[in-house]
Amino acid sequence: VSKIFFSGIGGSGVSAIASFMADKGHIVVGSDRSFDDNPAHPVYNILKSKNVSIVPQDGSGLDSSFDFVVFSTAVEADQPEVIKARRIGIPMQTRPEYLAKIVTGFKTIAVAGTSGKSTTAGMLAFIMQRLGMRPNFIGGGRVKQFKTEHNAGNAIAGDSDRLVIEACESDGTIIDYKPEHSIILNLELDHHSVEKTAAMFEILGGNTSGMIILNSDDAHLEKVP
């Protein structure tokens, strides 16, 4: 069991991983400025229902008892928790970096592409669940069928070794994912040039141990060797 601090825990990507790790039995503590401003935030209540401790985002809740800290990429370098984590020597990683580590512990299906990732990853996890495959799921969007009083719909903790993730190329960490299977939906000018994104998709394909499924109707995906 790990003791994990999530800074920026209210965002869709970070809250998904925090919820997932709490459901897997880990000790989860987090902070978010949106919770400081609005304690009635719906994600706040869902996390609290999972026994996640929420603290002010001023560094006061962070100490050396934590195994590591996961930061949202929206958290600034001069934020109090970043400064304190560096000062007391707690290992630090961004949300995408931590997701890449989680991927290695499962037979992961990574859903990539410049659009449609959230929808496709959610649909795939839902279909797998209905088929009795008991999948794990960490997404960016919220799946209506997964929403409950205790679940925002962006993650489920199944009891199988299968994990479905949304693999975003925006910050470049997609090249660190090593999934079993990959699905690449499309390729358009988005966060990066078509050529740069194609190069990242090529690396993802090289890191994929099993099948790679590409949309053959997308002309830009022809740029992915």
Q: Over which residues does each language-model region extend?
A:
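Phosphate-binding loop of NTP-binding sites
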Residues: F20-K24, G61-L62, T73-P225
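N-terminal leader/targeting and accessory segments in enzymes
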Residues: V1-T94, Y98, A219
